[in-house]
């Protein structure tokens, strides 16, 4: 959907879109910070969200990379600075067990407050953000040739999306999963899976397809 919109922008042309704020996985904040993913796409982003945190008193964690984690990537690929507001994944991530009764409403108010403050700043700013999008960040994610689009396997780790070093760090482990049977623990970092290198989340996703 986001890539289609970016390819067929209406009623506003791409030249009129200064930034993208994407709210994705914001229902389980708990006591954690509001994570801002892909702040490396504009030089102002880290300062904007530090200011929002100071003004609102809401804990915020700026994460420079991981732009390909969600729909902001469709805009980043076209040179538009984009970020994702993220509350953190849970063991119910992408499962039918992610039911409405588990939503942290107070946490969502915090996320909405952060979004509101950032949007008001952008609306009042007379000039565009200074995009700092690298060629690697702007490149569309491409699975290896012959890789089916559907995910065929699950290891059973909930990734730590705030982790930006090499590999994929487990935030938590799904009980009874292959990862649990292999004695993986929260905090462990995957560097290879089935003999294939796993340098980042995109590589990990491709291995499981």
What do the predicted segments below correspond to?
Residues 2, 32, 61, 84, ...:
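Extended hydrophobic-aromatic, low-complexity segments
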Residues 2-90, 104, 108:
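Metal-dependent peptidase/peptidase-like ectodomains
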Residues 3, 47-51, 73, 106-120, ...:
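Solvent-exposed, polar/charged alpha-helical surfaces in well-ordered, non-transmembrane soluble domains
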Residues 9, 25, 52-57, 86, ...:
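Sec/Tat-exported extracytoplasmic proteins
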Residues 24, 88, 96, 160-162, ...:
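Generic beta-structure capping elements
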Residues 81-85, 97-109, 193, 200-203, ...:
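Short, structured secondary-structure boundary patches
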Residues 91-138:
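His/Asp/Glu-rich mid-to-C-terminal helical/loop segments that flank catalytic regions of hydrolases
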Residues 129-209:
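C-terminal recognition in membrane/secretory proteostasis and scaffolding
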